[in-house]
Amino acid sequence: MNKVIITVVGKDTVGIIEKVCTYLAENKINILDISQTIVSGYFNMMMITDMENASVDFEKTVEDLDALGDGIGVKIKAQKEEIFESMHRL
């Protein structure tokens, strides 16, 4: 498995989940787990994905998701699981 953690944060608007999930599906990136909340009008989502069978590489995914986030007014960050874990270890 090639796990990648994707986080999405920003002002809540219609279609955020749809746009992110459409990108992932079109590029054969599997969603393993997802958590999403809205707090005082701010959207927060974390996804654990598997890029094992993806049709794009990790670097392209990072660039594409960054551009997608800019287009819909949110910040989207993709990190390999081992980097995410080392940055968020308590």
List each language-model region with its residue ranges:
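A conserved regulatory-domain signal marking ACT and ACT-like small-molecule sensing domains
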Residues: 1-90
